[in-house]
């Protein structure tokens, strides 16, 4: 089994406000694939497995949270969202109702669903909160008041 080698890439020319947002990407014919990396003292430290062309980029855009079928959420007793991020990818998501954690299920790579838990969720007014973070630490927060 091969172990990835570590490569240091000079990145002093990039002016950074958020050093966590910097990352290294592997260039292919059509795109730049996210590989991660850590900014340390003006250098990017990233694990690479093969020689090739790489690019240093900065991800400062927060993930996108898109509600799906919002008009039927209460009647169908579930919340559905599509999560996306244009560069480093979605790393974590957390759902809350009235400040309490609720478990969202990942249906596929980008769609999550919460089905109302009738034992924990009482009838009345509530607030849903969804927090999504990408691999560079950018965060989006979606809130939605609802009555059930």
Q: Regions from the language model: what does each represent?
A:
Residues 5-12, 41-49, 113-119:
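Exposed aromatic-hydrophobic patches
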Residues 52, 77, 124-128:
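Exposed beta-strand face motif in extracellular beta-rich ectodomains
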Residues 7-11, 78-86:
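Short edge beta-strand/loop segments characteristic of extracellular beta-sandwich folds
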Residues 1-22:
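Proteolytic processing hotspots in large secreted/extracellular or virion-associated proteins
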Residues 86-148:
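Long, low-complexity serine/threonine/glycine- and acidic-rich segments characteristic of extracellular
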Residues 50, 60, 132-136:
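Surface-exposed loop/turn motifs at beta-strand-loop junctions within extracellular Ig-like
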Residues 70-76:
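Short, solvent-exposed loop/linker segments at the N-terminal edge
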Residues 60-64, 126:
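Proline-centered linker/hinge motifs at extracellular inter-domain junctions
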């Amino acid at each position: 089994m091969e172990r990835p080698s570590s490569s240091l890439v000079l990145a002093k020319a990039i002016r950074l406000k958020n050093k966590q947002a910097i990352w290294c990407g592997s260039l292919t014919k059509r795109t730049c694939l996210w590989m991660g990396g850590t900014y340390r003292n003006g250098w990017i430290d990233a694990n690479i497995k093969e020689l090739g062309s790489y690019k240093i980029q900065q991800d400062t855009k927060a993930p996108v949270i898109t509600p799906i079928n919002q008009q039927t959420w209460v009647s169908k007793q579930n919340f559905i969202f599509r999560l996306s991020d244009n560069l480093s990818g979605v790393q974590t998501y957390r759902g809350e109702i009235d400040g309490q954690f609720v478990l969202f299920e990942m249906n596929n790579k980008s769609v999550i669903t919460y089905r109302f838990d009738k034992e924990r969720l009482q009838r009345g007014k509530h607030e849903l909160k969804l927090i999504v973070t990408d691999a560079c630490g950018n965060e989006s927060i979606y809130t939605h008041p609802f009555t059930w």
